[in-house]
Structure formats: structure tokens, C-alpha cells
UniProtKB/Swiss-Prot annotation:
<comment type="function">
    <text>Redox regulated molecular chaperone. Protects both thermally unfolding and oxidatively damaged proteins from irreversible aggregation. Plays an important role in the bacterial defense system toward oxidative stress.</text>
</comment>
<feature type="disulfide bond" description="Redox-active">
    <location>
        <begin position="235"/>
        <end position="237"/>
    </location>
</feature>
<dbReference type="GO" id="GO:0042026">
    <property type="term" value="P:protein refolding"/>
</dbReference>
<feature type="disulfide bond" description="Redox-active">
    <location>
        <begin position="268"/>
        <end position="271"/>
    </location>
</feature>
<keyword id="KW-0963">Cytoplasm</keyword>
<dbReference type="GO" id="GO:0044183">
    <property type="term" value="F:protein folding chaperone"/>
</dbReference>
<keyword id="KW-0862">Zinc</keyword>
<protein>
    <recommendedName>
        <fullName>33 kDa chaperonin</fullName>
    </recommendedName>
</protein>
<keyword id="KW-0676">Redox-active center</keyword>
<dbReference type="InterPro" id="IPR000397">
    <property type="entry name" value="Heat_shock_Hsp33"/>
</dbReference>
<keyword id="KW-1015">Disulfide bond</keyword>
<keyword id="KW-0143">Chaperone</keyword>
<keyword id="KW-0346">Stress response</keyword>
<dbReference type="GO" id="GO:0051082">
    <property type="term" value="F:unfolded protein binding"/>
</dbReference>
<comment type="similarity">
    <text>Belongs to the HSP33 family.</text>
</comment>
<dbReference type="Pfam" id="PF01430">
    <property type="entry name" value="HSP33"/>
</dbReference>
<dbReference type="InterPro" id="IPR016154">
    <property type="entry name" value="Heat_shock_Hsp33_C"/>
</dbReference>
Length: 290
């Protein structure tokens, strides 16, 4: 089971989240049939979204939109405070050649664009924030958003590693944030530690990457584990929800689906599940609209 661990330094000057999202990203790859580069781009977005949702309280939901002018198209993800996330990439078929070390590049091919977050607190007034894509690597873009939009200096590292068959091998990352009251000396100390950290891909390749991430962040410094939360890819779509959407169509359109198409098929963008509406199903909807 995927998980997110929340920690805080003994001094209370910093907090860090570390995540294992391997099964989440693996399931997303299976559902959307993504090729290598699309898998990594979507996976990083899902991880970033889970970090943002973990920062919220109550029954909030956070939507992340990575909108660039690249061949990836838009990447959309939605996560809640219960550890659930869903998402899709507009073009699942991007397969850019790897580097000599086997890395899948994303940033250089993301293009110009924006990192958009929409936080829904359930009050009917969602809060939207938009920051520019800085590198297109998603992790750096999330760090920039947290620092500039939420005014919380942050460091973020996240990645998805693939095996020789381009299947998800491991996925995860970390977020480190400065908390109010941190001294300049403490900030400088952790800035130096982050600069000296091994590459996120190296840490994820460790036998136990959760422990490797925590060791890289804290070293010998004492810290406290605050919480451990389970994470998963979970879509809340249903035939009933799509039936409600069909009810918003003009009756003539529903009649055409019934008489000309002998039914309708709706595919959920977020998880790829297909829902079939037979002629009888459409007849019920038409009668309900009457």
C-alpha cells in the first residue's frame, strides 16, 4: 500500500513529507495505457497533487492542472484529504528517447505553461491559484508554487522510475518546508543539506526509499513522525453520475442515441472505465426528463 509520512524536526523549524506512490502511478499507467514520458509526467503530477492534498484539512479537494504547450497536452489530477487521487494526461502516447543513464526527460519537452491549483473547501467558493511553469519538471514547479503562492519556502523532489520494459518500477518523493520561527542559521543548515542531497532518482532506487529519503533530509538530526497516511488511485465515477450528466442533454440528443446509435458508451477520462447505456437505459432517462 502506498503511503505518505508526515514528519517535523525536533526544533519545530521544518516539516517534511515523504511518499511512496508506486502502486498509484502503476495503476494510472495501466488504466491510461501511457507510454514512458507520459507515464512519468502523469505520475509526477499525481504525486504533487497528493502532497498538496495532504496539506489540507477536513473534506477538501485539490485539483492540479499542468497546462503546457507541449505534446503532452494538459495533465489533470484531483486528490482529496483521504489519500485518494485520480488523474489523466491528454496525450498518453508520448515516448521521448531516454538519456544515456535511462532517465526519462519531461521538463525540456513540457514547453511554456502554467501550474494551476484549485482548492475546494466544500463551501461553493473554490480557491484558484496560478503560477508559471518554471522548469516543467513538476517537482520544481510545485516548489515554486508553494513558495510564491502559499508564501512557504519549500523544496520538493519527486520522480517515477521505469524498468527496461517502461513499466513503473518505483514512484515517490518528498517535500520539505520552512515553518514560522525558523532561524536564519537553521534555514542555511537545511538549504545546504538539500543542495548536498543525492538525486531523487538515486534515493528512489534505494532498497527502502522511504528510509533513504528521511535519512537524506534529516541526517543525524532528530525528528518526529507525526502521521502515516495511506494513498491510492481511486476514481469516484459511477454510472449514476454519468446518467445525471446525460440528463442535462436535450431530449432530442438522447432520442438520437437511442434510435440511431442503439445506445451510448461513456468513458471516464480519469480512470478509463467504460459505462454502457442501452436503449432501455436511455428510454428511462428520456421519460424522467418528460
Amino acid at each position: 500500500m502506498d503511503k505518505l509520512i508526515k514528519t517535523i524536526s525536533a526544533s519545530g523549524a521544518f516539516r517534511a513529507y515523504v511518499l511512496d506512490c508506486t502502486e498509484t502511478v502503476r495503476y494510472a499507467q495501466e488504466r491510461h495505457h501511457t507510454l514512458s514520458s507520459s507515464t512519468v509526467a502523469l505520475g509526477r503530477t499525481l504525486i504533487a497533487n497528493q502532497i498538496l492534498a495532504a496539506n489540507q484539512k477536513g473534506d477538501s479537494k485539490v485539483t492540479v492542472k499542468v497546462i503546457g504547450d507541449s505534446s503532452f497536452g494538459h495533465i489533470i489530477s484531483v486528490a482529496d484529504t483521504k489519500g485518494h487521487v485520480k488523474g489523466y494526461i491528454q496525450n498518453p502516447g508520448v515516448d521521448i528517447k531516454k538519456t544515456a543513464t535511462g532517465e526519462v526527460l519531461v521538463g525540456p519537452f513540457m514547453g511554456q505553461g502554467h501550474f494551476v491549483t484549485i482548492t475546494d473547501y466544500g463551501t461553493g467558493n473554490p480557491y484558484t491559484s496560478t503560477t508559471p511553469l518554471i522548469t516543467g519538471e513538476i517537482g520544481e514547479d510545485l516548489a515554486y508554487y508553494l513558495t510564491e503562492s502559499e508564501q512557504t519556502p519549500s523544496a520538493v523532489g519527486l520522480n517515477v522510475l521505469l524498468d527496461q520494459e517502461d513499466k513503473v518500477k518505483v514512484a515517490g518523493g518528498f517535500m520539505l518546508q520552512v515553518l514560522p520561527g525558523a532561524s536564519d542559521e537553521e534555514i542555511s543548515h537545511y538549504e545546504k543539506r538539500i543542495q548536498e542531497m543525492p538525486a531523487i532518482s538515486t534515493l528512489l532506487a534505494s532498497e527502502n526509499h522511504i528510509d533513504a529519503l528521511l535519512a537524506a533530509i534529516y541526517g543525524e538530526e532528530p525528528y518526529k513522525r507525526l502521521a502515516e497516511e495511506q494513498l491510492s488511485f481511486q476514481c469516484d465515477c459511477s454510472k449514476e453520475r454519468f446518467a445525471s450528466a446525460l440528463m442535462n442533454l436535450p431530449t432530442a440528443d438522447l432520442q438520437a442515441m437511442r434510435d440511431e446509435d442503439q445506445g451510448a458508451e461513456i468513458v471516464c477520462q480519469f480512470c478509463g472505465i467504460k459505462y454502457q447505456f442501452t436503449e432501455a437505459d436511455l428510454e428511462v432517462l428520456i421519460n424522467d426528463k418528460a
